[in-house]
């Protein structure tokens, strides 16, 4: 009998998980402890100091008679600050699209208004370009700058400027840029 002759019992596209030897042993021990499975839980999170969150998607959760829980699943580190920043960026983008759609309906299409719009856009680009130039980082720790850029999602130049304004104090620089 070859592998081609074995009938497939698993439908295509099904989510199949392969358990390790240690996990199989642990599950057998759980069954011996008479723990009851808790259905309907889609995500378990454990919060640690400093907004560090361990998240387990699609966990297998069991409850003991004493009220303690046993959770099986793959734990992944989840950064809430990054999630919040992504959600805010998406919301701002959505608001900008709705505002642009509303402005497009009411905008004047005369040649003068189009020229004014182009001039305003070119002025905005120049201010951004000036901000992105070479930045003097002497006296500042590059790790501090990278942390501020990561936390506040601003350019490196703005992070350096904020650090200099607060004499190297990262907390106040982040608060200013947030």
UniProtKB/Swiss-Prot annotation:
Annotated Polar residues bias: 112-122
Pfam family, one: NAC
Ranges annotated as biased composition (Low complexity): 87-104
Domain UBA: start-end pairs: 140-178
InterPro entries for the chain: EGD2/NACA0like, NAC-like_UBA, NAC_A/B_dom_sf, Nas_poly-pep-assoc_cplx_dom
Single biological process term from Gene Ontology: protein transport
GO annotation, cellular component aspect: nascent polypeptide-associated complex; nucleus
Subcellular location: Cytoplasm; Nucleus
Compositional bias (Acidic residues): 127-139
Annotated keywords: Cytoplasm, Nucleus, Protein transport, Transport
Region listing for Disordered, in residue ranges: 87-142
Domain NAC-A/B: 20-84
Cytoplasm keyword on record: yes
Presence of keyword Transport: yes
Function as written in the Swiss-Prot or TrEMBL entry: Component of the nascent polypeptide-associated complex (NAC), a dynamic component of the ribosomal exit tunnel, protecting the emerging polypeptides from interaction with other cytoplasmic proteins to ensure appropriate nascent protein targeting. The NAC complex also promotes mitochondrial protein import by enhancing productive ribosome interactions with the outer mitochondrial membrane and blocks the inappropriate interaction of ribosomes translating non-secretory nascent polypeptides with translocation sites in the membrane of the endoplasmic reticulum.
Record family assignment: Belongs to the NAC-alpha family.
Protein name as annotated: Nascent polypeptide-associated complex subunit alpha
Organism: Meyerozyma guilliermondii (strain ATCC 6260 / CBS 566 / DSM 6381 / JCM 1539 / NBRC 10279 / NRRL Y-324)
């Amino acid at each position: 009998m070859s592998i081609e002759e074995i009938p497939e019992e698993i439908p295509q596209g099904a989510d199949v998980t392969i358990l390790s030897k240690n996990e199989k042993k642990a599950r057998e021990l759980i069954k011996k402890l008479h723990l009851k499975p808790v259905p309907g839980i889609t995500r378990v999170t454990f919060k640690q100091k400093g907004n560090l969150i361990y998240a387990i998607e699609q966990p297998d959760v069991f409850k003991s008679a004493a009220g303690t829980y046993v959770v099986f699943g793959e734990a992944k580190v989840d950064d809430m600050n990054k999630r919040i920043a992504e959600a805010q960026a998406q919301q701002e983008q959505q608001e900008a699209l709705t505002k642009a759609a509303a402005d497009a309906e009411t905008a004047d299409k005369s040649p003068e208004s189009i020229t004014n719009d182009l001039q305003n856009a070119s002025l905005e680009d120049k201010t951004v370009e000036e901000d992105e130039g070479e930045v003097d980082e002497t006296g500042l720790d590059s790790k501090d700058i990278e942390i501020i850029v990561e936390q506040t999602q601003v350019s490196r130049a703005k992070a350096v400027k904020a650090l200099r304004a607060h004499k190297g104090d990262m907390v106040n620089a982040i608060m200013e840029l947030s």
